[in-house]
């Protein structure tokens, strides 16, 4: 099927010496809002194909902005994906792989974050939600460029009620933090239903208090990662089970954030990005999202690495549009820096500004030769910068053999793939190996794969 139819602290910054002054908004200085879901499937929302969940506010966001059908993450696992977003670096560069547990160091402070880049330019910065890129004093939000913060330091399933490893996770209580201090020492099943509400209330309050200051607001929701929880006001309201209720509450959160921007007179000058850290955790069956693509979270296939993405910026991004341009979370930091007039970090990064692609500038081409994908510390695939071709190097991967149900996981088995080339325009599901048909394309991507492996994995 045709793709187009199918569908350190400030030490790392060049301007570190400027600190983070408050200043009146300069003309044209945009705000940035990132709504980052956890394990949401590409097809979880109506603009991307799901007809059943009542998510009218996400639908409206898409109708007022652009739906990006080919948006990628470099690794389809929590910590690696979030570190890539905030640092603009591949996991191979930062060595942040997989999902970190309690007290992990996470993203080394030598890598500047998006918060630090914009904070040094005078932006107010906040993160309300799941952090998961460091759980030590020097790697928690206050030390990483965020003026305000609240939420969990890691996934909401890393607690004493884990369905498979309760003894391991019970050694460390799941804590709720606020501005560098523990607010709730032990998160319980009574607290979890309030997470989406708490994150949203903090986000709305932050917007209302920063009408005159440019800001970065990062809202990495804990949902719809298992275990699923929703507040009383959404229980049974979707008509589509617990997962539908959770998505309905996230839709409400989007509405509250957009309403706060409008009432504060900021919606015309704010770039809103909504996406997910990776594809769905399909082993959880009816407690997981959906993707039409091959495999899911925890693999280098598009079911894991392709995330639904919506962007809204009135007057800049065409309302009601859809794009098949390919780009990645690593590109958001340099893109935001360009729009804010902020210097890039002093440390090397891998992302590049893709603003011309986002606004569909005539003749714009992707600045990357390729994008790379890994799972854990294992390099697995490269894709041409335009998203047309994808080459998998030989590797093993997990594939679902038995789906779980009602919060209990199913079973995986190990599978393997040989050296394989896929034409993503004609075969977005990665089913037909065309490596013998296009030897020149394969040779070019093999060269990029060898370069990436040598630089980051050998």
Protein language model regions, located:
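Formylglycine-dependent sulfatase
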Residues: 2-420, 426-458
């Amino acid at each position: 099927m045709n793709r187009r139819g199918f569908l350190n602290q400030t030490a790392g910054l060049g301007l570190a010496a400027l600190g983070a002054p408050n200043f009146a908004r300069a003309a044209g200085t945009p705000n940035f809002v990132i709504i980052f879901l956890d394990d949401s499937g590409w097809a979880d929302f109506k603009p991307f194909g799901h007809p059943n969940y009542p998510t009218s506010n996400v639908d409206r966001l898409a109708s007022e902005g652009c739906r990006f059908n080919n948006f990628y993450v470099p690794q389809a696992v929590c910590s690696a994906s979030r570190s890539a977003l905030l640092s603009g670096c591949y996991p191979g560069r930062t060595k942040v792989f997989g999902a970190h547990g309690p007290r992990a160091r996470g993203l080394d402070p030598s890598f500047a974050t998006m918060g630090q880049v914009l904070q040094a330019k005078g932006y107010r910065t906040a993160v309300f939600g799941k952090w998961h890129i460091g759980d030590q004093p020097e790697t928690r939000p206050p030390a990483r460029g965020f003026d305000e913060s609240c939420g969990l330091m890691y996934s909401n399933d890393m607690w004493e009620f884990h369905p498979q490893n309760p003894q391991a996770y019970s050694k460390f209580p799941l804590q709720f933090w606020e501005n560098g201090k523990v607010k709730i020492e032990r998160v319980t099943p009574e607290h979890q239903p309030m997470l989406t509400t708490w994150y949203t209330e903090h986000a709305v309050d932050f917007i209302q208090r920063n009408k005159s200051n440019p800001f970065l607001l990062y809202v990495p929701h804990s949902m719809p990662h298992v275990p699923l929880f929703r507040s009383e006001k959404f229980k049974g309201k979707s008509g589509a089970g617990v997962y539908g209720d959770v998505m309905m509450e996230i839709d409400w959160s989007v509405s509250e954030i957009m309403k706060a921007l409008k009432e504060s007179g900021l919606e015309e000058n704010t770039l809103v990005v909504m996406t997910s850290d990776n594809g769905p955790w399909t082993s959880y069956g009816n407690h997981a999202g959906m993707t039409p693509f091959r495999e899911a979270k925890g693999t280098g296939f598009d079911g894991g690495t392709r995330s639904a993405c919506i962007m809204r910026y009135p007057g800049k991004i065409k309302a009601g549009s859809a794009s098949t341009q390919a780009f990645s979370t690593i590109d958001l930091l340099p893109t935001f820096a360009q729009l804010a007039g902020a210097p890039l970090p002093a440390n090397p990064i891998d992302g590049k500004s893709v603003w011309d692609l986002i606004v569909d500038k005539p003749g714009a081409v992707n600045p990357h030769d390729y994008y790379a994908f890994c799972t854990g510390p294992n390099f697995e695939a490269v894709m041409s910068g335009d998203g047309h071709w994808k080459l998998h190097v030989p590797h093993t991967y997990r594939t679902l053999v038995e789906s779980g149900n009602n919060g209990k996981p199913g079973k995986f088995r190990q599978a393997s793939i040989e050296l394989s080339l896929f034409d993503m325009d004609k075969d977005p599901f990665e089913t037909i190996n065309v490596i013998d048909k296009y030897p020149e394309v394969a040779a070019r991507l093999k060269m990029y794969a060898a370069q990436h492996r040598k630089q980051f994995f050998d």
